[in-house]
Amino acid sequence: MGSRNIVQQQNRAEAAVPGAMKQKNIAGEKKNRRALGDIGNLVTVRGVDGKAKAIPQVSRPVTRSFCAQLLANAQTAAADNNKINAKGAIVVDGVLPDRRVAAARVPAQKKAAVVKPRPEEIIVISPDSVAEKKEKPIEKEKAAEKSAKKKAPTLTSTLTARSKAASGVKTKTKEQIVDIDAADVNNDLAVVEYVEDMYKFYKSVENESRPHDYMGSQPEINEKMRAILIDWLVQVHHKFELSPETLYLTINIVDRYLASETTIRRELQLVGIGAMLIASKYEEIWAPEVHELVCISDNTYSDKQILVMEKKILGALEWYLTVPTPYVFLVRFIKASMTDSDVENMVYFLAELGMMNYATLIYCPSMIAAASVYAARCTLNKAPFWNETLQLHTGFSEPQLMDCAKLLVAFPKMAGDQKLKSIYRKYSNLERGAVALLSPAKSVFVFLIELLMNAIEKIQCSLFFTSEIWCRF
């Protein structure tokens, strides 16, 4: 701690004449009272006669300001001592005393504020830490041994891998699902924001408008007569150059009416004409006139008969015409297929053949559309025949489509051999890619054979590995 020692100046004149200055010294002692002196560090000062005299200790009340001053002086002195590293130098009010003055420390009567130096951090290595350091390499060695054991192939892992290989389980990379609506974001007619919800709604209500098996309730009509009617309607549709939506809606109206009303044989064609008139008014901008339909039917029915049948059909269907036909799903599924025009023409060819055959009535419209896309890809060998994007948008997996696809693949060959060739001639034209002339798909049947062979191989491999395990043990 730094101290402030006040050295009294000795007046030589007073020392020479002590008697004369006695009264003055008494008054001087009162004035020179060391009220601010440090009682802890006193120094001896040589007098005039050369003898050392001790400076009397002075005490004063310790105030807060005085304590703060002492603490500041102590910190300043400690910093100066660290820098200069000088011994025996005493600073009094910032001024070094005379070299002739010898500094001597007197034991302090009171404890002054002491600034303790910051203790140095000492790291002690205990025997426990030494043991831990010795144990760490051992633990690392054990971990390395465990990892080596894990990497080493075991009998169980080998047999598991062989079983997966035998069962046909293959590790294949996850296919990326393509956003088929990305190109139509700026097309307002594509309604990209609502298209997914629309098709979810179509799939939820498609069974409500699907006709059931009605041939058992029609005494005068059979499946062949229905096929003849639809073949003729395809010709009328092509003659008037109507849209595909009109054809699919016409067939839907015919089946729904026949499922609800018993019809005699001579009125079957009239039902087809009335259904064509209703569908044309619903889908087309310019629908055919009634007299045009009379002419195309070779005047078999009059205008009044056609209008009466139109009203009768609408009453039986309760004017419910907004139904999801296979064409509604075909447009979406062809877009998800992302293929060329040949595949598109083949899809429509197979779908129309399916609509003409009564056997497809047991399948829902979305199933017929999805199976048509799958069969067309198989026919034109567009690998992969089915992918994640198609499965997402159709809602059907490849095995679910196999039964309907087999039925559709068999129709082209039958269409070429039968007399009902309206659809066959329509798609034999070069404008539609002449897809009707292509050979039917063999991929579907090959796929079924592969499934059968894989099942046989699984059984054989499981028996082989079971015997191998027993031989090892």
Curated annotation (Swiss-Prot):
Known partners and oligomeric status: Interacts with the CDC2 and CDK2 protein kinases to form a serine/threonine kinase holoenzyme complex. The cyclin subunit imparts substrate specificity to the complex.
GO biological process, one term: mitotic cell cycle phase transition
Keywords, alphabetical: Cell cycle, Cell division, Cyclin, Mitosis
Protein name: G2/mitotic-specific cyclin-1
Source organism phylogeny: Eukaryota, Viridiplantae, Streptophyta, Embryophyta, Tracheophyta
Pfam families: Cyclin_C, Cyclin_N
Presence of keyword tRNA processing: no
SUPFAM superfamilies: Cyclin-like
GO molecular function (one): cyclin-dependent protein serine/threonine kinase regulator activity
Family membership: Belongs to the cyclin family. Cyclin AB subfamily.
